[in-house]
Amino acid sequence: MGEVNRAKSIVFLFLPVMLLLSIPAFSQQGNAIERGLQAGTGAGVEQVLTQSTDFAGEWVVRNWQNRLERSAGPSLGDYLGMPLNAAGRMRAETFDAGEWSVRDLQCRPHPVPYQWRAQGAMRIVKEVDPVSRELVAYHTQYVRSLDRAIYMDGRPHPPDYAPHTWEGFSTAHFEGNDLVITTTHLKESYIRRNGPTMSDQVKVTEWLTRHGDYLTIVTYIDDPVYLEEPFIQSVTYQREAHTELEYFPCTIVNENISDKIPHFLPGKNPWLKEFSEQEGVPYEATRGGAETMYPEYRAKMKGMKVAPLKPTPSAF
């Protein structure tokens, strides 16, 4: 009994000490949260704030800003408002729409950032660490695109010589309630369906902002090879809880039997002036360039020569 009494005495002796040691830990956390709230900076409550905007779920695209991209598509030779440099313009002018029928390209997924403007629904899924319960990554999934991981755990981007893919390598962080995504290591691919292209040196920054059931994505394409200035676009999605992504098996078929790769040599594309002649837009303006993005360019267009209008040829 004497040993039992001594053990009880030790427990009662150390219990107040343990309580005293544990109080500062809780009070420090509470004080940090309180200071962050009072300062309005969110310091001390970062984990709470980073989970306050949840992007997970099913979304459907509302192409209010990009109707041109999902209708018949922009015309050949129409680069108005695109900051193409000389190399980017030459690359775009070699485009032949017949390339979409090439077997090697039929099943290629839409690249970042074009996939935001693809038709159909999108799903955003959270990858959560099962032990720490911290957010490891968001995954975006589209009808005809690969699973895109957007890492949230602070991992660095790989070195320049790492493989480039259609979805690239994406990391993200929160700025307030906005999710800011940085993507590198992309393959060269299209940023518009009529020829304008981004190189494999491109860096894409995206801002995701949620307002209730609406999600706005702003993309900032910075390409030192093909663009004079960054190309900025936006698109809106709406949350739709009853939407489900359909199964999309891609089957390669012989759509265009040819022994040539569809393309035009520089200066040999005969369709570049068609848009200008049919729409009454100065041909010089249709060549694009950074200055065509700004409202002031309209005044310059007034002094440009416009070719006589030619009627659009009938398809029947």
Labelled PLM ranges:
Residues 26-316:
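PEST-like low-complexity, intrinsically disordered acidic/proline/serine-rich tracts
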Residues 12-22:
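Bacterial N-terminal signal peptides
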